[in-house]
């Protein structure tokens, strides 16, 4: 029976991962089209705004925080192992809402990054050059990096009951928010507005979708 039970559990996980992958594929395509499309548009505009304060430019550049910044990719995988299908669908809807709201704000309020991007980052150059190639510094307010982090952490926090895991999720979220500042990808307003967007999509889209199921 143990072998049969293990095999059945393995099949359930496989089906769950495949289901998540089928959700993630079109979402990733939609993200690429919307995010890079709006960035392309705003990079060609001349009415971009300075949405930061001068003191923020004194925030230190900490290259090693790029690992924490990139840990969002790990966070994105966790729902496949912890959420039900109805929860995954609700999460996908929440992400779409966050993406379109952010895109509308990017077009209405295009911004310029105040930090000067370095030409060379010793020890991390390849990683940062790849990041700079993907992200033109105009889709700033709100930070989708932060909004996505906040949304996923809120959803996982709700679904997992362990006090230690919940505490770890909160710490992870704090470090993710700090990382976008310390690798000079965003400013303070971007982080605050990203947190607000993530929370609103969690409360108004995810929670309502779950309550209807």
Question: What do these predicted ranges mean?
Answer:
Residues 128-213:
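Membrane-embedded catalytic cores of phosphoryl/pyrophosphoryl-handling enzymes
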Residues 19-27, 68, 89-97, 165-169, ...:
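Alpha-helical transmembrane segments of integral membrane proteins
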Residues 22-37, 92, 96, 100-104, ...:
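Hydrophobic, lipid-facing residues on alpha-helical transmembrane segments of integral membrane proteins
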